[in-house]
Amino acid sequence: MSIRFARKADCAAIAEIYNHAVLYTAAIWNDQTVDADNRIAWFEARTLAGYPVLVSEENGVVTGYASFGDWRSFDGFRHTVEHSVYVHPDHQGKGLGRKLLSRLIDEARDCGKHVMVAGIESQNQASLHLHQSLGFVVTAQMPQVGTKFGRWLDLTFMQLQLDERTEPDAIG
């Protein structure tokens, strides 16, 4: 298994992983699936913004993906990113999520980001545990802010401070 930067050719596999999460889990709070063109547009927007899209790969097959983007679009949030990590269901439980997220944290630090945010459906114990094990702390619980599969969903926000800067725009 290897982790590498995604290529446009990976977007069909990324769409497949995304769509499985849409159809069968509460990890993505969308009801509509996407096609490869949608993921290509997403990929191009991320890379144009200077943000990484990573994939895990085994024997030439994309088994997961991870990325981060702006947490909010206002200038004051420029040092904060929100991430996503998804693993193909056939490859879950093998530590790929941990490897992808660990690499993504390194990429965020390399980009000079200060905080990484995770928005996690509050019943997703595997994701909550993974994030906690990598140093994320719970910062907010938001009951019944979403809905999927005919039920209310609660949202847990977690965050990881990526550096020790005391001044927001200090270099080094």
Swiss-Prot record:
Q: Which GO terms describe its molecular function?
A: acyltransferase activity, transferring groups other than amino-acyl groups; L-methionine N-acyltransferase activity
Top-rank taxon of the source lineage equals Bacteria
Applied biotechnology uses: Expression leads to increased levels of N-acylated L-amino acids which could be used in a number of applications.
UniProt-listed SUPFAM superfamilies: Acyl-CoA N-acyltransferases (Nat)
Give the catalysed reaction(s), semicolon-separated: L-methionine + acetyl-CoA = N-acetyl-L-methionine + CoA + H(+); propanoyl-CoA + L-methionine = N-propanoyl-L-methioninate + CoA + H(+); L-alpha-phenylglycine + acetyl-CoA = N-acetyl-L-alpha-phenylglycine + CoA + H(+); L-methionine sulfoximine + acetyl-CoA = N-acetyl-L-methionine sulfoximine + CoA + H(+)
- A Pfam family of the record is Acetyltransf_1
User: Matching InterPro entries, A to Z?
Assistant: Acyl_CoA_acyltransferase, GNAT_dom
Q: What class of enzyme is it?
A: transferase
> What Enzyme Commission number(s) appear in the record?
2.3.1.-
**Where does the chain bind acetyl-CoA?**
85-87, 93-98, 124, 133
Boundaries of every N-acetyltransferase domain copy: 1-163
Please provide the record's keywords in A-Z order: Acyltransferase, Transferase
Say what happens when this gene is deleted.
Cells lacking this gene show a reduced growth rate and a markedly reduced yield in glucose minimal medium compared to wild-type; this phenotype can be partially rescued by adding L-phenylglycine to the medium, which reflects that other enzymes may also catalyze its acetylation, but with lower affinities. The deletion mutant strain also shows a consistent change in the level of several metabolites whose masses can correspond to L-phenylglycine, L-pipecolate or N4-acetylaminobutanal.
Its biological purpose is as follows:
Acyltransferase that appears to be required for E.coli optimal growth rate and yield via the formation of N-acetylated amino acids. Catalyzes the acylation of L-methionine using acetyl-CoA or propanoyl-CoA as acyl donors, and the acetylation of L-phenylglycine. Is also able to N-acylate other free L-amino acids and their derivatives using a CoA thioester as cosubstrate. Using acetyl-CoA as an acyl donor, substrate specificity is methionine sulfone > methionine sulfoximine > methionine sulfoxide > methionine. Asparagine, lysine, glutamine, aspartate and glutamate are very poor substrates.
The similarity comment for this entry is: Belongs to the acetyltransferase family. PAT/BAR subfamily.
Q: What is this protein called?
A: L-amino acid N-acyltransferase MnaT
